[in-house]
Amino acid sequence: MDILERLEHFKDYKYMKRNQEEEIRKQEAIVHACDAMHLPDSLKNQLFQDVQEAKGKLIAIELEEQREGQELESFLNEYIQDDRIRYILCRHYIQQKSLLEVSKKISLSYGYTKMLSSKGKQMVKKVVIE
C-alpha cells in the first residue's frame, strides 16, 4: 500500500468504531427497556451477553487501530524524509482523532438517550464541523 492508501485505510477505523459504539448504545437501550418491562432473567442475561460481546469487538477494533497507527507512524518516519510533510500528515491524523474524541466526550456527557434524538446528533455535528 502506498501512503495515501494507508492513511485512507486508517480513517476507516473511525467509522468502524462509531458504528460499533452506536450498536452498543442500541443494545444497552434494549437491555434497559427489558429491565423496565420485567422480562425473564434468561432473556436479560442473553441481551447483556450481547452487549459484552459488542464491547469486546469495540476493544478489538481499538487495539487494531492502535497497532495500525503505530505501523503507519513508523512507515511515515521511514519513507518520508521531509519533516514538514511528515508533520502535516501526522497533524492531520491527530486532528481527526481528537475531533472524534471530543464528539465522543460530548455525546457521553450529554447522555445516550439525548444523543439518539435528532437534536443531540445536530449538536455533535456542529462541534465536529467547527
At which residue positions do the language-model features occur?
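DNA major-groove recognition helices of helix-turn-helix
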Residues: 109, 113-127
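N-terminal functional module detector in eukaryotic proteins
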Residues: 88, 128-130
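N-terminal positioning helix adjacent to the helix-turn-helix/winged-helix DNA-binding module
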Residues: 68-72, 81-85, 116
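Short, conserved sequence motifs enriched in acidic/basic residues, glycine, and aromatics
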Residues: 79-80, 107
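Short amphipathic alpha helix immediately N-terminal
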Residues: 81-97
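N-terminal interaction/assembly modules
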Residues: 1-78, 130
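Short alpha-helical "recognition helix" segments of helix-turn-helix
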Residues: 102-106
